[in-house]
């Protein structure tokens, strides 16, 4: 197997996958580089070339997991700051910006899911991997993939129902408004 062919064939998909998980271009670039360094060093150990795709994505997935372990506290702090900024931002009137905000709102809610649910949603819905491919990447059964996907969607629906109010404005733009939770009196 020629490394540069592998690189050309998989770079765009690996980049899309990693970026969907880490949501940071600089971090994604580092993880992509690490992924292909590991691929280059270990491709000779791959016994079954039919599993090449899942092997490459498993490497990328594990590197993302390592990154999340290292930065979990930082991510939690950044998420709180981001949510506070959104609540204080005021009304938005441009259609494109509202659509972007809707997407960002849903993505922020996806980040509230457990990591295993986030990963399955990204692999299936964004990356369009099959249940079989996801099972190979995550090293779990196909049935477990289906269960996680079902639970992830159900939990995301619950989060969206609890934390968002969806409306269609006068221009037929679907918008999401965060639900402001009332503060209880401390007694």
Tell me what each language-model feature is.
Residues 111, 115, 119, 127-144:
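Helix-turn-helix DNA-binding module
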Residues 30-37, 50-62:
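Structural recognition of an alpha-helix C-terminal capping motif at a helix-to-coil junction
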Residues 1-16, 32:
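A short, charge-rich alpha-helical start-of-domain segment used by transcription regulators
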Residues 47, 58-79, 99:
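Arg/Lys-rich amphipathic alpha helix in sigma70-family domain 2
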Residues 36-51, 71:
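Sigma70-family region 2
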């Amino acid at each position: 197997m020629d490394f540069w062919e592998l690189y050309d064939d998989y770079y765009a998909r690996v980049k899309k996958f990693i970026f969907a998980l880490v949501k940071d271009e600089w971090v994604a670039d580092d993880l992509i580089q690490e992924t292909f360094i590991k691929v280059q060093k270990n491709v000779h150990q791959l016994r079954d070339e039919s599993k090449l795709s899942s092997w490459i994505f498993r490497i990328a997935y594990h590197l993302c997991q390592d990154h999340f372990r290292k930065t979990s506290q930082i991510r939690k702090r950044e998420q709180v700051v981001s949510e506070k900024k959104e609540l204080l931002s005021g009304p938005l009137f441009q259609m494109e910006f509202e659509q972007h905000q809707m997407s960002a709102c849903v993505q922020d809610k996806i980040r509230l899911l457990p990591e295993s649910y986030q990963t399955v949603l990204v692999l299936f819905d964004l990356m369009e991997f099959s249940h079989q491919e996801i099972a190979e990447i995550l090293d779990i059964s196909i049935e477990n993939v289906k269960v996680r996907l079902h639970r992830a969607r159900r939990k995301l629906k619950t989060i969206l129902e609890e934390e968002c109010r969806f409306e269609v404005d006068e221009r037929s733009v679907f918008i999401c408004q965060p639900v402001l939770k009332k503060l209880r009196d401390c007694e």
